[in-house]
Structure formats: C-alpha cells, structure tokens
Amino acid sequence: MYIAKYWGDFIGGSDDSLSLVEFLEGLDKEEITLKEIFTGIGLDRQNMDFRQTVGNLRFINSIGLEIDFHYAIDIVTDLAAILLECRITGHLNLRELYNNEDTQNRCIQVIATEKEYTAIKDALEDFVKNPKSYDLYEMIGDDIIEMAEIVKELRKELLQYEL
C-alpha cells in the first residue's frame, strides 16, 4: 500500500478513521464518488470549510448503529490519503488499512471530480497554513504542528497527480 508512509498516527489513526473505513465497507460497491462520501456522512454541510466541525457528521452502519465523526479535518486528511492511493495504484484494499480480519478484503476506488479534487487540496493547504485554527487542535494540542507537516507532504504528492 503506497500510503502506508502516511497512514498511521495522524492520518488513518483516529476513531474517525475507523469510522470512515466502516462507512466505506458499508457502501458495498467498488467505485465510490467523493460526493457520495461527503453526502453520506454529512461533510457536504461543511461547505468545504473544515476548521470547525458542524454537528451531526454521522452514518448508520450495517447493524443499525449510529456512528459519529468528531473532527471533519480528520476525515478530509484520511480521504486525501485514500485519493492518493487510488491515483497511484488505481484502487485501495480496505483490509490493508488496518490488516484486520474483520475488515473485508475488498478493493475500492474513490473517484473525485476536478472541482472536488481541487477543494480537497485547498482544504489541506489551509490546514497546513493554519493548523491551530482547527477544532482538532483542542484535542491534540501542539502535535497538530507535526500533523500539519505530514499533511504538507501528502498534499505535495497529491499535486503531482492532477486530474
């Protein structure tokens, strides 16, 4: 998995990351649009501003439980890494994200329009420039500076793979 160098503590390492993988599994399809993801969990209500998380970012899982997301920027950074993986390898195996036997051994491809792709890169740039302006800062404190450096590298790679 190409994004293994990013997927860990700050990107892919949160409760929101686990919830995102569960959401993607629940879609039970190979090709998933970014719009489906945004609409499915409520990120579309953020209007591409992820500094402060708008309430009610959630979905209902396959057994009927309501799963909440806490920090919009966590989801966006995870999705950026997933987009990068899909750009480089053409797909993402959900099981590789956590090497968990409970996770389906299934490949997906997340598709973004040029406008969505640009919006994600812009959101990452804003995070890199203003990490302490994000609600996640309240949770992780100054570690957000280290996260911003990782996101900076991720964004740089995304720029190499323009639509």
Model-predicted segments: where are they?
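Non-catalytic all-alpha helical scaffold/repeat segments
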Residues: 1, 36, 40-46, 51-61, ...
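N-terminal leader/targeting peptides and immediately adjacent processing regions
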Residues: 1-49
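Amphipathic alpha-helical elements of HEAT/ARM-like alpha-solenoid repeat scaffolds that form extended
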Residues: 15-24, 76, 80-83, 148-155
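Residue-level signature of the C-terminal ends
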Residues: 26, 30, 44, 86-89, ...
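Hydrophobic core segments within long, regular secondary-structure runs in both alpha-
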Residues: 31-38, 42, 80, 111-125, ...
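Structural motif
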Residues: 61-75
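Amphipathic protein-protein interaction modules
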Residues: 71-135
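Low-complexity intrinsically disordered segments
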Residues: 117-163
